[in-house]
């Protein structure tokens, strides 16, 4: 809509709201914004005051600067007045598609790796000489330090989602029946590779029996290359398994909505574009290394099939495609020179000496060139040893260098070790490391592949990535 006023425009109301999901522009040779009692300017990300001339700041009673932001709750559209449909990962989810949502920590899902963002987003901190809390700078050891929730980061996380208010829950929240945090519907976002089929769960919650709708329909805003197993949902509380098939490339974001018979939107899911323009292609080779550290018994590294599956699944969450799949080759390091340079005797057992890590990388990379020439020059090269890796304090199952194309794994690694370490190589820090990233999370609370949740007495299976991590791995993600 375009409206032109030639002379004077005046609008007046007891309360007024200008709201846009995209952009609002106010332009004039002179603009005055007045808050007679209070003027508040807020940004969840970055606020810029820009002048090509001069900036003046005036305060009759002084000016102050603080490094702590106020919280701000923006005005949100109200929908879902009679029921709500939440889209969730399937019960047997194994990381095969990306799914990012605002965690509210439903109690029945806690043991499966769910949790509350309001208890989990913040930083592990040290105390400086002045007694102030400062974020840990050692990303590998941060988990050993105390954790503190950061409310500004939680607000930032909320604002990273599109959301609306759940009408019937908001009404109950206003009279204290429903917790305040439960009436906001944060729209989840997901990724899936072309020519794949995935399972989701639609969880239906109803208001009073007399207020329930007659019908709940499921529909895409644009159905090209997408198929859905259900076009309607039962009008009863409970869970329904849905199957979404992606039969080709998606060149733009798609929206799945649940709509009642009166046109009320009661659930929404965003599916991000997955066309070649939005994918990142890499090449990967897994190298099994044959050794003879004691001079007698040969050992060859083993590639656990589940490690390949999980590695590919996690990459696919970020729309990272391994061109032609993971290659597997073998190199021979049974020569005496290798054993003498890299073995470490612990008790009666020989293993690889971790302190020789840099020399080990140089040695095996030269061996790759000697064996295969330059065939694997532009590959992520991942080595597997049949030997343990010993340190003075204990042992390592594997490691990779940040922002590199190299990783190495030893006897004792598990299926999650490979994607965890190789995503370090691709630029991801630990999930509890709050340095140079938008968010950090309390140690061992998530099923994120970059967490240390396997340290728990009852380990949480690590298999997922957050939306912001997708963007680090693949800058073509939208």
Give residue ranges: language-model regions.
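Small-residue (G/S/T/A) turn/hinge positions that recur once per unit in extracellular repeat modules
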Residues: 221-233, 392-405, 436-438
């Amino acid at each position: 809509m375009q409206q032109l006023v030639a002379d004077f425009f005046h609008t007046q109301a007891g309360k007024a709201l200008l709201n846009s999901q995209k952009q609002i522009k106010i332009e004039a040779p002179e603009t005055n914004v007045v808050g007679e009692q209070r003027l508040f300017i807020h940004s969840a990300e970055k606020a810029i005051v820009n002048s090509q001339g001069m900036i003046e700041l005036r305060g009759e009673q002084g000016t102050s600067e603080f490094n702590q932001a106020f919280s701000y709750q923006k005005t949100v559209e109200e929908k879902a007045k009679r029921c709500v449909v939440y889209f969730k990962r399937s019960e047997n989810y194994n990381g095969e598609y990306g799914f990012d949502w605002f965690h509210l920590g439903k109690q029945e899902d806690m043991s499966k790796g769910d949790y509350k963002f309001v208890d989990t987003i913040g930083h592990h901190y040290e105390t400086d000489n002045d007694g102030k809390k400062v974020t840990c700078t050692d990303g590998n050891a941060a988990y050993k330090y105390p954790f503190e929730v950061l409310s500004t980061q939680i607000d930032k996380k909320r604002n990273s989602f599109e959301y609306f208010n759940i009408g019937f829950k908001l009404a109950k929240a206003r009279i204290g029946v429903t917790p305040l945090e439960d009436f906001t519907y944060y729209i989840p976002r997901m990724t899936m590779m072309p020519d794949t089929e995935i399972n989701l769960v639609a969880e239906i919650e109803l208001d009073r029996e007399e207020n329930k709708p007659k019908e709940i329909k499921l529909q895409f805003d644009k159905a090209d290359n997408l198929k859905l197993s259900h076009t309607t949902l039962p009008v009863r509380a409970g869970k329904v398994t849905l199957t979404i098939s992606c039969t080709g490339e998606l060149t733009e974001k798609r929206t799945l909505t649940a709509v009642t018979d009166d046109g009320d939107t009661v659930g929404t899911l965003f599916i991000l574009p997955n066309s070649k323009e939005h994918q990142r292609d890499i090449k990967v080779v897994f190298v099994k290394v044959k050794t003879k550290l004691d001079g007698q018994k040969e050992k060859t590294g083993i590639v656990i099939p589940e490690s390949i599956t999980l590695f590919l699944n996690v990459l696919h969450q970020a729309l990272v495609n391994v061109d032609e799949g993971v290659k597997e080759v073998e190199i021979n390091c049974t020569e005496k020179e290798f054993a003498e340079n890299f073995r470490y005797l612990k008790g009666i057992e020989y293993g690889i000496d971790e302190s020789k890590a840099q020399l080990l990388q140089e040695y095996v990379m030269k061996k790759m060139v000697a064996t295969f020439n330059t065939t694997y020059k532009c590959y992520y090269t991942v080595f597997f040893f049949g030997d343990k890796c010993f340190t003075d304090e204990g042992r390592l199952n594997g490691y990779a260098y940040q922002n590199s194309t190299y990783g190495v794994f030893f006897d004792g690694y598990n299926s999650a070790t490979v994607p965890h370490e190789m995503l370090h190589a691709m630029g991801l820090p630990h999930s509890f490391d709050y340095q140079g990233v938008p968010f950090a999370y309390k140690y061992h609370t998530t099923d994120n592949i970059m967490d240390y949740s396997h340290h728990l007495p009852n380990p949480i299976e690590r298999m997922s990535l957050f939306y912001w991590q997708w963007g680090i791995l693949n800058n073509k993600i939208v």
